[in-house]
Each structure stands twice: as structure tokens, then as C-alpha cells.
């Protein structure tokens, strides 16, 4: 099987063309491939499939390193767009794809960045899903013998965002896994630790569902900005500084889609016998 290794700000992917190759990935195989000592090593596996709708260009599938399939990955979406153009699967700059959660438009810009229409953030608890009686801007949770204030949103996948004074000293390693599997998140969640530098700039670390802390999480950056705007903390255009680098997020508010812009890097091509 041929594959490419790619990354978006250090969030790394194994990307496989299932348009011209006949492939099947079991959870066991994905876990073996994800092993950084015995396999290829990656945060997520991205699979390019033929479209299910003639109006679309491709179907986009995402699997975490633990073998679970998820509906959204923003950094992966940028790498997906770069991959299908590099491999000659399309020459379009606006690439329309379906996911398990709906549809997305991926745009390769003139300066070789990728701009992703991530859709409108959904704050309804049932959409996340999150166990709550009604939608709130801020929720109170108990975890690890602490009282935690957080915002909750779906970006096609579940996110919990906590504001911290300094991301460098945030309890990502201890609080992240506890909140990820908290009983109020029946499908688990991605946990973002957000430091507001100013209204146009945040710093962010994300403990990803099924992957642990990564160098960057695109949907996590989108979620943090959406929650920050909803809570009145942030402007409509925000620079997000992650351990792996910078993303630019823009959202005009309810009724509008949120846009993420950032790089996608091809590292190498490989071949593996399954």
C-alpha cells in the first residue's frame, strides 16, 4: 500500500489514496500502523475515498491512532486538500468533500496555504453531545477534585474549552484525560486549554480525544475561538498560537460559517506491505 506522511503544524498524518487503491483498515491494523516504534507513526490516519455524491469531489475519513473513526479533523482537512492535488487526483483549488458529519469546502490559496470552511459552530449540548439541561455560555464541571469553568461546542466533533492564565503551566497531562472521558461527554471530547493574550491572539494546547496532546489541533483552534467569541473575549479574526505553529481563525458569529487558514506539509511518500 502506498501512503504519504504529512503534517499540519506538527499534527502528523498517514494519508492513503483509496480512490486508486483497494484498502481496508481494521482498528487493529490502524493501531499497529500508528505505533511510532513498530509502524509508521501518526496522530491520525486520513483516507481519501471516491465521492458518494456527484456534486462532490471526494469523501474524507479520519481515524485516530487508537483505531476509532471520527467525523472531523481540521489540520487533516488541510493536508487532505494538499494531498489530492499533489497526487493528481484533482487540480481544483476549491475542493468539495463529504465527511461523516456533513460537507466541507477546502480552498488552496495563492500563497499555498489551505483555507477550510469548517461550518457553523454548534453550541447545543445535544449536538456535542454534552449532558446539560440547557445551552449555556459557561458550564461548571467537577473533575480531578476541582471545580472547572468551561465552554462546550461541536465543530463536527466534541470540544471542551477551558480558559487558563498560562498554557505553559496548564494541567494538560493530568486534567486532559480526566475531562476527555468525563461522564458528561458520552462520546468523549477534545479538551482545549486557552490563554487569551489579547482579543486578536490566543495561545492554545489541546488534549485530543483518542490521541492525547498533539502539536496542533485545527478543530480545537476553531472551537477555542468560537467559545471565546461567544463569551465576549475575542474579536472576529484571531491568531491562534499552538505548540506546532500558527493558525488563523475567522468567525462573524451565529448564522455564519467559521474559517480556518493554515499550512499543510508533505513530508515523504512510502510503501508498506500489509
UniProtKB/Swiss-Prot annotation:
Which reactions does this protein catalyse?
(2S,6S)-2,6-diaminopimelate = meso-2,6-diaminopimelate
- Quote the InterPro entries the UniProt record gives: DAP_epimerase_AS (IPR018510), DAP_epimerase_DapF (IPR001653)
Q: Which UniProt keywords apply?
A: Amino-acid biosynthesis, Cytoplasm, Isomerase, Lysine biosynthesis
Q: Pfam families, from UniProt?
A: DAP_epimerase (PF01678)
The residues the record assigns to binding substrate are 11, 44, 64, 74-75, 157, 190, 208-209, 218-219
Location in the cell reads: Cytoplasm
Q: What class of enzyme is it?
A: isomerase
Annotated function: Catalyzes the stereoinversion of LL-2,6-diaminopimelate (L,L-DAP) to meso-diaminopimelate (meso-DAP), a precursor of L-lysine and an essential component of the bacterial peptidoglycan.
Family to which this protein belongs: Belongs to the diaminopimelate epimerase family.
Annotated protein name in UniProt: Diaminopimelate epimerase
Q: What organism does the record attribute this protein to?
A: Escherichia coli O127:H6 (strain E2348/69 / EPEC)
Q: Which gene encodes it?
A: dapF
Amino acid at each position: 500500500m502506498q501512503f504519504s506522511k504529512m503534517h499540519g503544524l506538527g499534527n502528523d498524518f498517514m494519508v492513503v489514496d483509496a480512490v486508486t487503491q483497494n484498502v481496508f483498515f481494521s482498528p487493529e491494523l490502524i493501531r499497529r500502523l500508528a505505533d511510532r516504534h513498530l509502524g509508521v507513526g501518526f496522530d491520525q490516519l486520513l483516507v481519501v475515498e471516491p465521492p458518494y455524491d456527484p456534486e462532490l469531489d471526494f469523501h474524507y475519513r479520519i481515524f485516530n491512532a487508537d483505531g476509532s473513526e471520527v467525523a472531523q479533523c481540521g489540520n487533516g482537512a488541510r493536508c487532505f486538500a494538499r494531498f489530492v492535488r499533489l497526487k493528481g487526483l484533482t487540480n481544483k483549488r476549491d475542493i468539495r468533500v463529504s465527511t461523516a458529519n456533513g460537507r466541507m469546502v477546502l480552498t488552496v490559496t495563492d500563497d499555498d496555504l489551505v483555507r477550510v470552511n469548517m461550518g457553523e459552530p454548534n453550541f447545543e449540548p445535544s449536538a456535542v453531545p454534552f449532558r446539560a439541561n440547557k445551552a449555556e455560555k459557561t458550564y461548571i464541571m467537577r473533575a480531578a477534585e476541582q471545580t472547572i469553568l468551561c465552554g462546550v461546542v461541536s465543530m463536527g466533533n466534541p470540544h471542551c474549552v477551558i480558559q487558563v492564565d498560562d498554557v505553559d503551566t496548564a494541567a494538560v497531562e493530568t486534567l486532559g484525560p480526566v475531562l476527555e472521558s468525563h461522564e458528561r461527554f458520552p462520546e468523549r471530547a477534545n479538551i482545549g486549554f486557552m490563554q487569551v493574550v489579547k482579543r486578536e491572539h490566543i495561545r492554545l494546547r489541546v488534549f485530543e480525544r483518542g490521541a492525547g496532546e498533539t502539536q496542533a489541533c485545527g478543530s480545537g483552534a476553531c472551537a477555542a475561538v468560537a467559545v471565546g467569541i461567544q463569551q465576549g473575549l475575542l474579536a472576529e479574526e484571531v491568531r491562534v498560537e499552538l505548540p506546532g505553529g500558527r493558525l488563523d481563525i475567522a468567525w462573524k458569529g451565529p448564522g455564519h460559517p467559521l474559517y480556518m487558514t493554515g499550512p499543510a506539509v508533505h513530508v515523504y511518500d512510502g510503501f508498506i506491505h500489509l
